[in-house]
Amino acid sequence: MSDKIRTLQGRVTSNKMDKSITVAIERQVKHPIYGKYIKRTTKIHAHDETNQCNEGDLVAIRECRPLSKTKSWTLVEVVSKA
């Protein structure tokens, strides 16, 4: 197992839960036949201890131990406000 901690940047799509946010991570994938780059989105639940995020914020998150059934990421910082 590698010692490198995974960090990602994404946009907050929901902050309706207490101390939790939903972050959309966008990546580009090359189509196997046509070669065109397509946008793909992954939604991740992350822990926001102080409830400081709002919808549309650009945030940095890092992987951590499982905090619940779906949460295993935590908020590092708010890169830019919406």
Swiss-Prot record:
Select a single GO molecular function from the record's annotations and give it: structural constituent of ribosome
Q: Which UniProt keywords apply?
A: Ribonucleoprotein, Ribosomal protein, RNA-binding, rRNA-binding
**Superkingdom per UniProt:** Bacteria
Q: Cellular component GO terms, alphabetically?
A: cytosolic small ribosomal subunit
Question: CDD domains from the xrefs?
Answer: Ribosomal_uS17 (cd00364)
Keyword Ribonucleoprotein on this protein? yes
**Which Gene Ontology BP terms does the record give?**
translation
Q: Which InterPro entries match?
A: NA-bd_OB-fold, Ribosomal_uS17, Ribosomal_uS17_bact/chlr, Ribosomal_uS17_CS
Which SUPFAM superfamilies does the record match to this protein? Answer: Nucleic acid-binding proteins
Q: Is the keyword Signal assigned to this protein?
A: no
Family membership: Belongs to the universal ribosomal protein uS17 family.
What PANTHER family would the database entry show? 40S RIBOSOMAL PROTEIN S11 FAMILY MEMBER (PTHR10744), SMALL RIBOSOMAL SUBUNIT PROTEIN US17M (PTHR10744:SF1)
Its biological function? One of the primary rRNA binding proteins, it binds specifically to the 5'-end of 16S ribosomal RNA.
**NCBIfam families hit by this protein:** PRK05610.1, uS17_bact
- Subunit notes for this chain? Part of the 30S ribosomal subunit.
Descriptive protein name: Small ribosomal subunit protein uS17
Lineage of the species this protein comes from: Bacteria, Pseudomonadati, Pseudomonadota, Gammaproteobacteria, Alteromonadales
